[in-house]
Amino acid sequence: MAAAGGSSNCPPPPPPPPPNNNNNNNTPKSPGVPDAEDDDERRHDELPEDINNFDEDMNRQFENMNLLDQVELLAQSYSLLDHLDDFDDDDEDDDFDPEPDQDELPEYSDDDDLELQGAAAAPIPNFFSDDDCLEDLPEKFDGNPDMLGPFMYQCQLFMEKSTRDFSVDRIRVCFVTSMLIGRAARWATAKLQRCTYLMHNYTAFMMELKHVFEDPQRREAAKRKIRRLRQGPGPVVDYSNAFQMIAQDLDWTEPALMDQFQEGLNPDIRAELSRQEAPKTLAALITACIHIERRLARDAAAKPDPSPRALVMPPNSQTDPTEPVGGARMRLSKEEKERRRKMNLCLYCGNGGHFADTCPAKASKNSPPGKLPGPAVGGPSATGPERIRSPPSEASTQHLQVMLQIHMPGRPTLFVRAMIDSGASGNFIDQDFVIQNAIPLRIKDWPVMVEAIDGHPIASGPIILETHHLIVDLGDHREILSFDVTQSPFFPIVLGIRWLSTHDPHITWSTRSIVFNSDYCRLRCRMFAQIPSNLLFTVPQPNLHPYLLHHVHPHVHPHMHQHLHQHLHQFLHPDPHQYPHPDPHYHHHQQADMQHQLQQYLYQYLYYHLYPVMHHHLPPDQHEHLHEYLHQYLHQYLHQFLHHHLHPDLHQYLYQYLHNHMNPDPHHHPHPDPPQDPHHPPHQDPHQHPDPHQDPPHQDPHQDAHQDPHMDPHLHQHQHPQPQPHPQQHPNHPQQPPFFYHMAGFRIYHPVRYYYIQNVYTPVDEHVYPGHRVVDPNIEMIPGAHSLPSGHLYSMSESEMNALRNFVDRNVKDGLMTPTVAPNGAQVLQVKRGWKLQVTYNCRAPQSGTIQNQYLRMSLPNMGDPAHLASYGEFVQVPGYPYPAYVYYTSPHMMTAWYPVGRDVHGRIIVVPVVITWSQNTNRQPPVPQYPPPQPPPPPPPPPPPPPPPPASSCSAA
């Protein structure tokens, strides 16, 4: 023992000795001689602190290296297990012996680290036991956020079922790490090298994994998905499965989930559910809905089919070969049937391209009068109306269908299924669906001829109608679409190759899923939240059409007929308002009555507009004959216009348009025509007839020109007072939803359809702004002016010049600055204020060399706030008001204008009505700040000292 531990005179080793050494020297110490062990402790205390911790750092590094080797060892063992499974499945390979590999496994372990050998090397043979099944191994995780939850659950399940000991956190972390691939494996390697404590804390490691790879917006995305989820044409089982999958990511209570589940059900199931006792749980609600759906299906199958049996029965179901079908058509012989089957011809009509169950001849024979059957798009021939023939049973599985949401201002959202067909040339909508939902229509610029797959034109003829721009949502994807109106009974909406080529979506045909990941959709089709309106404009009336004022003087010319005919054509055809849908049951015997009523409407419309303008511009001596002249001329002109110049197909559209917009109130206007008495000319107020000899109540045009310096003088020359809309609504009028705001006979609503200009200054991506500038303004120069005046130019330092170049280049790239063709460009002035460079714009200097047209300027509310908080208003007439009203000027002055916001897929400019307002008080230029800033005023002088007290007198002292 003395030999083992008594070498007290030997120097200590470089690292300090461990605390539990084997020195068992019990020799008593001499009080006079210092002990060698005390000398060693004193020397150990004098060493630096980093050398004292050197042993611990080295041990920790060795442990980390061994643990990383253990991770690689586990991965190799799993790879070997995969090979063993492949060899077990192959009956021919029986000579495989895993013993050599098992003998080589201990070579990777460290002989000095006995603990690591016991934790990693010893349990390795357990992976080769028969109790562990290879199918229970979790799938490799590559960092996909959608697969993080299943991966964590599979790892937990495997560790609980496995015979291997996973009680140590280090083994659990190594196992999970071996299941990571791709970017997830790279993250785990770097994370474990930096944070070594995670190797001994399985819970903390899984929390870090979840924090990195879990979708932070998972809950918000689940809320949006579950609110848009609808049952649609599918069964309740599929709807409930999708609902429960989304509900897993939400923390909603069960009553909230039950309410949302009922919102997405079909109306028939929801109606039947309301007649029963309310279920208590979500599972009971789903079970009740499934029972209701099955009962409705049984009732529908037991109900006799009112349609003709020949439409749904196959041709070989008839037994009598001599029984005529349709009176004159006999049954086919066996030879003829065999020939048509071999040549893939229709068994009903003998033509190619379709089969007997979808034969258009059969559909046209059984279709009602006035409705032509035929294909809806360029593709396979379509069938007859859906109310006569039911679709085939495989219709829901053969085609790619999606659920669309169509938004129209002031109307409930429409949910409709659409088919995606790459063989269709455009985007189509069924005319029955349009009529049923009153979707606004307009006449196309050019008719479109659509052909079927066999090259023949469709039976419904050329397409002459299209819908207005509608907001269409497909999941999180929002766009603006215009559909061509045709006949498509099986699919109300068809999205064709034009839609596919524009958005370029990623379609997975096996799962029927669509992902919009193209650059076009990322920048233009994102879902924007509706921004609430902070202010409501004072509602003006729409402005008088400019070219109507332009043609006032030609109207009083002797050649008035030609100019009025040209004006009426220009006014009717490019009218921005909607054309009503055609009535499929229109009969020709109603044409005479319709033309008579149409003539009265047009007479009232033209008389109402022409009389006040002509009364204003004609000499006073011609006022008394003005009514008689207009009365005779308009009757003669309209009769000739309707019978010789206007196409008969447009009569009905024009009649319905004027009937909806000019139908007089029966309580106030029993006669649609103006009075025939020349002493009672047409009125300026729709409810009162003023005297024609009385001067118009408007001011003198020369005085109007000086009323407001911001107004265009040319506009005031033709300005005339217009009638005020009736303040009272008709009692039979249906009450509008609270979405509208009634103000003076007009309504204003939140601009849902203008979402793409609300966020025009909000970047949708890093340094990417949506395009919002349509045209480049043209500046008219004063004749003789050579150039616009410029300010003084001062030299700039190199750093200031680089800062200006970077600023301009960055904003041109982002789209906030656009190159212009205007003379002299923009007046950019670089100023240095408070140690910061700023770019300002001098907007007063160019006015001395340009023509001041005083265009109507648009002002937005809350100009100091971000621009996307501004709201726009659109003005439409209240139904029941008989006359279109026009702008009248009050203070502050307001009117409407068409503002370009972009282009559609055809390249046509999309304009929206906006509010234009100007006022002397709200448009004053702010004072220009002085540079350098003025010195503060000097402080006021101090107050004078108080006067001294008077001296005391001798009398008072005595």
From Swiss-Prot:
Additional observations: The PEG10 locus is imprinted, giving rise to paternally expressed proteins.
Chief location: membrane
Gene encoding the protein: Peg10
Zinc finger residue extent: CCHC-type: 344-361
Biased composition range(s): Basic and acidic residues: 662-715
Organism: Mus musculus (Mouse)
Protein name (record): Retrotransposon-derived protein PEG10
Comp. bias intervals (Acidic residues): 47-56, 85-110
Tissue: Expressed in a subset of adult tissues, including brain and testis. Expressed during the early process of adipocyte differentiation. Expressed weakly in mammary gland but strongly in breast carcinomas of a c-MYC-driven transgenic model.
Disruption of the gene: reported phenotype: Embryonic lethality resulting from placental defects.
Subcellular localization(s) per the UniProt record: Extracellular vesicle membrane; Cytoplasm; Nucleus
